[in-house]
């Protein structure tokens, strides 16, 4: 039985749709970089890409990223911090 495992997402929050984008029917996405902690939480989210820019998708994605939960990376039975993890949040209108 292996004592090693890689990080796996166990909870992905739904970001709040930016109000201005929602009322104008705008769709988009944002990519956030996070550090996964030894306990599977995340810290230090940074928006690295937003499309289209200026509609609030990046800000909403950063807020949602703080609620991401992972099973942490484990090496020799010990949780490891994992930097530079990218997560893409998509914003799509209900059809």
Region locations from a protein language model:
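Acidic, low-complexity proline/glycine/alanine-rich linker and hinge segments
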Residues: 1-23, 59-69, 95
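A short, well-structured alpha-helical segment
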Residues: 26, 37, 41-74
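A beta-hairpin/wing motif
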Residues: 24-40, 57, 76-95
